């Protein structure tokens, strides 16, 4: 009996170690809708990004596959210097690869350079989207304050929220801005629709599989996006109330630039 126990103890220890490692691996992986840890990469000086982003003459970076199954984006600056961004979580043939190239090359979005991740499936918080849109539209600092019950004015993203609110691109809900809430697909489309000047929404939502889920306030924006080709069902799902992913935001901005151009709102 004692011999059996001596044999069983090492087996149990091995199982315990194995389970502990598995649980640790689970903790290290974030769900696509989890809060992204890239806040620090979005902290940028307002004056330094006033002219961020490209335009009709923008030259995108060169994409090359890397040994990790991801891709490298090599961006050439006006002075001829180059910088290579390595992403292990973006395959060169992914439906969002060109969009990632676009936002990285134009300086509109970034990734985690230390971990070499873009995190394409992660959701985008409202505060982060304010920073992204500020970069994309070439925003400039504004003196006008934005009064929200959940903002003190000391937040690193406050200047970008002020600009978004001042331009009428984003608002609050019940006196709060909800900076940590994830932006939905419909909400992202509404912001771009406003940036475009709320053009006449020609056409209908016929063929859009989630038309019944579109809110009354978002109908014109989604109709415009659907009929202009800003969103399609070829590459991913554009469910109105679903949290918009970083990959989807990159794609929206690339298509918007091709369709309308970047606006200095």
Segments the model singles out, each with a brief description of its role:
Residues 1-12, 21:
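N-terminal Sec-pathway targeting helices
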Residues 9, 18-97, 110-130, 134-158, ...:
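Feature responds to low-complexity, polar/acidic, surface-exposed segments characteristic
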Residues 98-106:
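Mature N-terminal segment immediately following signal peptide/propeptide cleavage
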Residues 104, 165-166, 226:
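Alpha-helix C-terminal capping/helix-coil junction sites
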Residues 222:
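Catalytic cores of secreted/periplasmic or lumenal enzymes
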